[in-house]
Amino acid sequence: MSLTRLNIEAFRNIQSAQLIPAPGINLIYGQNGSGKTSILEAIYFLGMGRSFRSHLSQRVINNDDDKLTLFATLNLARGDSKIGLRRFRSGETEVRIDGEKVKRLSTLAETLPIQVITPESFSLLFEGPKSRRQFIDWGAFHADPQFYGAWTNVRRVLKQRNQLLRNGSSYSNIQFWDQEFVRYAEQVTEIRNHYVDSLNELLKGIIGEFLPSVDVKVSFTRGWDSKTDFAELLENQYSRDLATGHTVSGPHKADLRLRVGTLPAQDALSRGQLKLLVCALRIAQGKLLKQQIDKHSIYLVDDLPSELDAQHRQLLLKQLTDTGAQVFVTAIDPAAIVDSLHTPPSRMFHVEQGRVTVIE
């Protein structure tokens, strides 16, 4: 899978741009503030319906416009597919895939799987369990068609249960919801656990190349003691949950733990090693997607030269090239990327003040 055409209108400082990307490595270069990261952000927005730089999606709309428009042609195994997205300043989002209106943004993610490696990727290790759950759930969503339904039901039942707790409801009123909660929680947990087991098999080899002298252990924690029956736990913790006004244990507390010896990876590794660990996780996830559903991710790599030294840039770019996936990588100085590649980039784009030029 690859993007063969990308149109961007009124997205940040890009008033209008059309790119014809190539399979393989697409290098986008320009000075800070030129708009090169905005191209990556636009691709991500098209695949996720939101930005990886801001939680306020209206901010990505150009100041002179009331809406942004993104359009892409995808080359898929079954043929070409066309995706269009409009985001209005009012907050409304309009999505079409092959001319048909799409109601769920999850359909975008299913159609256009994206991996992002940016200077902010450290959030995966430092921001607490939520970002790591999202990492697991991205893979579980793509790997198992049952996951999304079970996950949305967990969220629905958990919301209802927490509302009852805040209202001071008796356990007899909560028990019905607990039966549903247990059923969907166990389904989500089984899929997550299986996914992490599969990821681990690939991850060992990639971490071995990036960090050959470091033994990183990766494990999944479900959000409650695995030796305890979840239904019993919910009943036994009712008084505690009632006092706090929310459900203390469950799949919403799951985590992906990375340890070196007895220490969390973020305490045991240097900043440079942690960068490589995050890169390894993203590459492993993309490779596993290809194995499981025969679909490539698209990789968006922002400001690579500032994040890794020359040796590790070369190693990362080799790993990305070996995936066979389409890659978009940004840099201020194109030589920093070109010199780290074994072969020239498939295509190069220069960005200046929001204007994009292909370099022949």
Swiss-Prot record:
GO biological process: DNA replication; DNA synthesis involved in DNA repair; double-strand break repair; SOS response
Coiled coil: none
Gene Ontology CC annotations of this record: cytoplasm
Location(s) in or outside the cell: Cytoplasm
Alphabetical keyword list: ATP-binding, Cytoplasm, DNA damage, DNA repair, DNA replication, DNA-binding, Nucleotide-binding, SOS response
Main location class: cytoplasm
GO molecular function, one term: single-stranded DNA binding
Top-level taxon: Bacteria
Binding of ATP, residues: G30, Q31, N32, G33, S34, G35, K36, T37
PROSITE patterns xrefs: RECF_1, RECF_2
NCBIfam families per the UniProt record, alphabetical: recf
Similarity remark: Belongs to the RecF family.
Reported function: The RecF protein is involved in DNA metabolism; it is required for DNA replication and normal SOS inducibility. RecF binds preferentially to single-stranded, linear DNA. It also seems to bind ATP.
Entry protein name: DNA replication and repair protein RecF
